[in-house]
Amino acid sequence: MTETNSSRRSFLLKSMAAGLGLSTLGSLPLPAFARKSNMKLGLVTYQWGKDWDLPTLIANCEKSGLLGVELRTEHAHGVETNLSSRQRREVKNRFADSPVTCVGYGSNFAYHYTDQAEVRQNIEGTKEYLTLCKDIGATGIKVKPNGLPEGVPKEKTIAQIATSFNEVGKYAKELGQLVRVEVHGKLTQQLPNMKAIFDQVTEDSVKVCWNCNDQDLMAPGLEANFNSVKHWFGDTVHIRELNVGDYPYQQLMNLFNGIDYEGWILLEARTTPADRVAAMKEQLEIFNSMTNA
């Protein structure tokens, strides 16, 4: 980001804080809004932002106070690898002229397939989108393992996934990007399996993106599962609505506070509220309450 864009963003953040009646923004690069925690709430365009074009998405994030966004693939914002160099600069400038941070890109690339040509296709696709992330001013791409195929030894698939992560991770590091591995997939979202994968990951640009699955609560429990992979946490976490279901979000926030986590907590909402901006504001209020606990 240029010095001009950085100053512009700082001005926008301070103006937003003043408009919300917040007098203690200080010199923080992003608005902590007087929270004790340094965690920040943002949005994944999974459902609530899927039909918003880019100007609308940025405007609605500004209105709600969710000042970070992970752009999901094949959504209405249209940020894909077919963008020209000029269009990529335009996307980057839109974010630079806003208090909203483009955290990264949410892809569906995965590397567990038995067909090695499909694995290679996913690796090369990841690299193309990592270049896009760099060009638009984002800092990384979300990928995932998505299962352990039947009929293949688990250890073989785990090693294949880790090897793929190492290849795309090396490429990401050269671009100054991160590979954020969503804890995902019928079997791979079980934390012992995710740990087994990361035990073979050698690139420090490859990070775990916690995903708030029911499997997190399997024995030996949330805290133990959290601790088993916290060494690899990056700067993104996916949550669902904080007031829906029975996932122990307050305990999770306490655990992240306990390790002084300073990354993005990204809302991957699944409900269909009549007013999504109002719903985003509500989630921010709940989040602030939980992170002040």
Walk through the language-model features, giving the residues of each.
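N-terminal small/glycine-rich loop or linker at the start of catalytic domains
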Residues: 33-44, 102-112, 148
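Acidic (Asp/Glu)-rich catalytic clusters
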Residues: 36, 58-63, 83-103, 127-137, ...
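Active-site acidic/histidine proton-transfer and metal-coordination neighborhood
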Residues: 15-29, 92-101, 111-208, 215, ...
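Extracytoplasmic "Venus flytrap"
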Residues: 47-51, 76-77
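Flexible loop residues that form catalytic
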Residues: 74, 110, 146, 242, ...
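Conserved beta-strand positions in the central sheet of alpha/beta enzyme cores
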Residues: 70, 104-106, 142, 238, ...
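Glycine-rich, proline-tolerant flexible connector loops at the mouths of alpha/beta enzymes
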Residues: 72-92, 146-152
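Histidine-acidic metal/acid-base catalytic patches
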Residues: 2-42, 49-65, 188-293
